[in-house]
Structure formats: C-alpha cells, structure tokens
Amino acid sequence: KEKGIENYILSGDAYPHRIPKYNDAERLQIFRENAIVGMLKEQTYTEERCTIIQEFQKAGNDADEKHVGKYSWYESYLRNGRRALENYLGTEKEINFEEVNRLVHAFKAGGEKLWVRHMGREETELWYEEKDFTGIKVLLVEWTHSNSEYYSGVDIPIYLDSTPQETLQSRLERNRDQWIDNPFTMMVLDIEQKMLKKQSEKAKLIVTRDGTVLDRKEYAQFVPKLQK
C-alpha cells in the first residue's frame, strides 16, 4: 500500500468448519477415541489400563509422553491418537478450503463485490461482510495453511518460518487456545509444524524469524537440513 498498490488482507482463521472451542473439542475427541480404538486393535487395552488413562484424561495430560516411562503400553495410546490427529489437522475435515478457493478464484476473475467470512470464538460470532474489491490489485491471504495441497489459486506462496515455541508464545499472547500450554496442545503444534515444514517446499519466498526474505535456494543454505 505504501507503494500505491491497493491490497486486502484475508484471514484464513475464519474458515475452519467449527468455531475455536468446538474445533479444540473435536481435535481432543479424535485423539482420545482413536487412541483407545487403536489399542483395542493392537490388543494393548485392558479395563485396568483404561482406569489409568481416564485419570490422565481428567488431569488433562493424557498426551504427555512422560507416561510411557512408567507404562510401556502407553506408547500404543499416544501413537494411535497422534496418527488420527495427523489425518485431521489441516485437512478438508477441519478447514473449509472450498470456500476459500471460491473467494480467491472469484477475486482473480475480477469480482468486485465478494462476501468475506468472519469468525469469533462464540456460536453467534460467525458472519459475512460484503467487501468491495474495486481497485484492489493484491489479495494477501494470511493463513497457517496457505501452502496446503487443498488450497489453490496462489500466485506467490510465502512461508513464515517459526518454531513450535514461537507459535505457542504467539497463541498465548492472542489467548487463542484452551489448555494452551498442555501436552495435547504441544502435540498439535508439533504435528502442524512438521506439516508446515513439508508444505514449505511449495513456497517461492520464505520470511525468516528476523524478517529476512529468502527464495528457496537461499533458504536451503540458511537451513542446511532442507538440503538432505
């Protein structure tokens, strides 16, 4: 905008299927249910072990890997729950990619008045705003999933490099999650971070933690492990 190019920033945070507290609950339910079902399939489940698991669940720390140190069978619970989470997070099951894609393609086709979605934290905080895009030349989509395989229409994909700890700090400041610093949230962040690192291969530009803008080749030199 400083250079005279009109733009609009669209927040992808408004496009999950569920408001934050319901999506948090869905994530936890998926983890816990599939953890138990997986144990049943592997024949590592017993009624006695279920009692132990339920105590951890009540304490809100059933995703803590430290439990494996005392109960070796607990690895089955964690592994099966995590696998189910990996199949949910950042997919069409969680995010309404179709609606985002429709908006992006409508903008690129020259649409002038488009409905933009907004989402708060409560059931009543979901609404649409008719935005006039007349004269707007650039649509910036600010989104965790901007390099997702489910998302189309991006001309210049950008990846913002960060660590799970930095993401956690950002969410603490925004008060975005329930149980923000518990083991389950850290598991979610770890899964998302690995997913984003993989998707970063699609990015044409990478912004490092100090604000430096790099292309793919420069970033590979900046982060040697990407060259492996």
Predicted ranges, named:
Residues 19-22, 150, 169, 212:
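Short, function-defining helix-loop hinge/capping sites that tune catalysis or transport
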Residues 156-160, 165, 169-177, 193-228:
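NTP-dependent small-molecule kinase module
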